[in-house]
Amino acid sequence: RRAVNQLSPEQLDWISPGRPRSMRQLLWHSFERPVLGIEAYESGQYTEQMVRRYEELAQNYRTTSDICAYGDKIEEELAEFLKHGDRLAKKVESYMGPITVHELIELALGHAIQHLRHAYHYFPMMGVEPDRPLDPKAYADVPVPEDLF
């Protein structure tokens, strides 16, 4: 939320170099990714379409407040889901092959952290000084690529 709240409405529409996507898409997707694990648990499927839907769905969140409210909602859903630890062992079909919900949520967390790292990399390009970017020690136990890109 701290990163999202540093941006103006105009900066949410800023398009990143290399892989063109808006900051709105990048940051909303960071919140959205863990819920895909919950949906995979419920449906038994984890598809490429699920992974790509953020490209359009993020457009429904126009302000930083909208994005943060969505993040709050997802955090609550994930906390409730994780109260039932037995759900994590369920194997689901995915475009990567069979995978447990635990592995999906762990991948989602690493993916979200990686996108937050991307956002902080892009901030100076928009004239924004990152406010207390996430320290690598905070996610030392999460599988996050060493390379930024």
For each predicted feature, which ranges?
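Short, contiguous alpha-helical
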Residues: 9-54, 93-149
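His/Met- and acidic-residue-enriched segments that coordinate or traffic transition-metal cofactors
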Residues: 1-2, 7
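Short secondary-structure junctions and interdomain/linker hinges
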Residues: 7-10, 85
